[in-house]
Amino acid sequence: MTKDRLAALHAAQSDDEEETEVAVNVDGHDSYMDDFFAQVEEIRGMIDKVQDNVEEVKKKHSAILSAPQTDEKTKQELEDLMADIKKNANRVRGKLKGIEQNIEQEEQQNKSSADLRIRKTQHSTLSRKFVEVMTEYNRTQTDYRERCKGRIQRQLEITGRPTNDDELEKMLEEGNSSVFTQGIIMETQQAKQTLADIEARHQDIMKLETSIKELHDMFMDMAMLVESQGEMIDRIEYHVEHAMDYVQTATQDTKKALKYQSKARRKKIMILICLTVLGILAASYVSSYFM
């Protein structure tokens, strides 16, 4: 009896340990996904910040180009915005690459679960959004470069030194502002201001080209990632759309069924009422007959 009692206690203890282990695993799983979604929100917030900064950069570009003279304060604010974009973009890229590596490790281990699919979908969505924002930033930088070129070209025409696009590009490749001022006589204050503006625009272009080159590798890396994920996202969107169509069809069928059910119910009620009335009439007739 003592041995049997001891064995039962050991068995009960083993069951408790298994239940505890399962509970711990479940809690750990929930905690892992909570941490993942917190990371997703953090990345989304950083992408939104980059997007807001890109819009501010556009405003600064317009302010600089519309000003008759170079505003150093505005230019410094523009440089600060560009530095902030670069910092946040690098952080986003690093976090997305980290998620990508974790997903690849699980796929190599032949792990497949709903959580893995969720993480892949979230990663793809964030990557696409990030590439869209950075594409807009790249477009903004390129557009500003062209506008600066146009302003330099107009200013050179004012100083009596007209240039075409090819000549201007060659001048820009020199990387030296003095290329634009060679042979120009600065007799008036207006001429000096014009040349100063040309040099300022040239410096802007040089900074832009540096910024664009720094972002190029990041942009290509993320663009290739999104392209490789495109087919998967398209499949997800396809199934979601068809699921919505199915839900709408099912809803319509349900409404029809309810409508037919309601009609059938009304028919049953009418038949019961008729039978009741007929029963009352028959009873009245029989009772009057025997009386």
UniProtKB/Swiss-Prot annotation:
GO terms for molecular function: SNAP receptor activity; SNARE binding. Residues 1-268 are cytoplasmic. One of its GO terms (cellular component) is lysosomal membrane. GO terms for biological process: cellularization; exocytosis; exosomal secretion; haltere development; intracellular protein transport; liquid clearance, open tracheal system; membrane fusion; mitotic cytokinesis. Residues 1-20 are annotated as: Disordered. Keywords: Coiled coil, Cytoplasmic vesicle, Lysosome, Membrane, Neurotransmitter transport, Phosphoprotein, Synapse, Transmembrane, Transmembrane helix, Transport. Pfam families: SNARE, Syntaxin. It comes from the Eukaryota. Plays a critical role in several secretory processes, including cuticle secretion and neurotransmitter release, and probably assists in neuronal membrane maturation or the final stages of neuronal differentiation. Essential for embryonic viability and development. Required for coordinated peristaltic contractions. Recruited by Unc-13-4B to secretory lysosome-related organelles (SLs) that are essential for tracheal lumen fusion between previously separate tracheal branches (anastomosis). This is Syntaxin-1A. It comes from Drosophila melanogaster (Fruit fly). The gene is Syx1A.
